[in-house]
């Protein structure tokens, strides 16, 4: 399994992400995009995101992930989404592991953080297996955890 990243998201791949996400409904979209992005998801919204990376397995587009912001020596990532038909095959684990390595290539970054909703147990398990630890719980509007991994 060869995972690679490309900066940005093509129109064709943005269309695929919209199809995958919109077919799973508004509450699903809020879990991976956050509550500020209107439903249904559109190509334009995806293409306007800064720091977005397309994830490929070989030549096949399989998902995306975003470098959201940098706070001092911490890089916050999110909007990590793998094609639902490809989930459960280890792609997410491989992609996350490789993306974390890519982020840590920047020597100014000492830690990586992300948010995960309490109800998203599958994602929490993945993040914990990859060395992320819960550092904070946020209650409003829905309980979520801030998880962090240090170098």
Task: List each model region and its residues.
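Acetyl-CoA-dependent GNAT
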Residues: 3-85, 96, 102, 106, ...
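Conserved beta-strand segments that form the floor/walls of ligand-binding pockets within enzyme
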Residues: 76, 81, 113-115, 146
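Short glycine-rich hinge loops at helix-strand junctions in the catalytic core
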Residues: 90, 107-108, 131
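Conserved GNAT acetyl-CoA-binding A-motif
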Residues: 105-115
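Conserved active-site alpha-helix within GNAT-family acetyltransferase domains
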Residues: 93, 118-136
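Active-site acidic-Proline motif in GNAT/NAT acetyltransferases
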Residues: 83-85, 89, 118-119
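Conserved beta-strand-loop-alpha-helix junction that forms the acyl-donor binding cleft
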Residues: 114-124, 140-144, 150
């Amino acid at each position: 399994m060869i995972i690679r990243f490309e900066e940005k998201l093509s129109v064709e791949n943005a269309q695929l992400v919209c199809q995958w996400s919109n077919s799973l409904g508004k509450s699903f979209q809020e879990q991976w995009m956050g509550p500020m992005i209107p439903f249904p998801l559109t190509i334009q919204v995806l293409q306007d995101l800064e720091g977005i990376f397309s994830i490929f397995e070989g030549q096949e587009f399989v998902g995306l992930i975003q470098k959201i912001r940098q706070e001092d020596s911490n890089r916050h990532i999110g909007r990590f989404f793998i094609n639902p038909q490809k989930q459960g095959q280890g792609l997410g684990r491989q992609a996350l592991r490789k993306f974390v390595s890519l982020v840590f290539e920047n020597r100014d970054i000492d830690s990586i953080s992300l948010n995960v909703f309490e109800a998203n147990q599958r994602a929490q398990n993945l993040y914990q297996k990859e060395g992320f630890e819960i550092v904070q719980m946020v209650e409003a509007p829905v309980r979520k955890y801030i998880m962090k991994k240090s170098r």
